[in-house]
Amino acid sequence: MTEAEIRDKVYDIIVSKMGVNKDQIKPESKFSDDLGADSLDTVELIMELENEFDVQIPDEDAEKIGTVQQAIDYIVKK
């Protein structure tokens, strides 16, 4: 899977889980500050990323994922 394909899937997950428009999402968007996620939203988003991409994201790594690009980069590395 290419980085572009991963990015598109991550964007789709954010749209479905957080109820934002795709055009509101930018790589530098912060889940909490820019996209309005609370802590539960963030946990659900991480769980959905794990399911979609078949990766395990330990809590200590999940805490470091604060932007859309950080999520994409993490998945690309796995």
Swiss-Prot record:
This is Acyl carrier protein. It comes from Chlorobium luteolum (strain DSM 273 / BCRC 81028 / 2530) (Pelodictyon luteolum). GO terms for molecular function: acyl binding; acyl carrier activity. Pathway: Lipid metabolism; fatty acid biosynthesis. It is found in: Cytoplasm. Its main location: cytoplasm. The keyword Transferase does not apply. NCBIfam families: acyl_carrier (TIGR00517), PRK00982.1-2 (NF002148), PRK00982.1-3 (NF002149), PRK00982.1-4 (NF002150), PRK00982.1-5 (NF002151). The gene is acpP. Residues 4-78 form the Carrier domain.
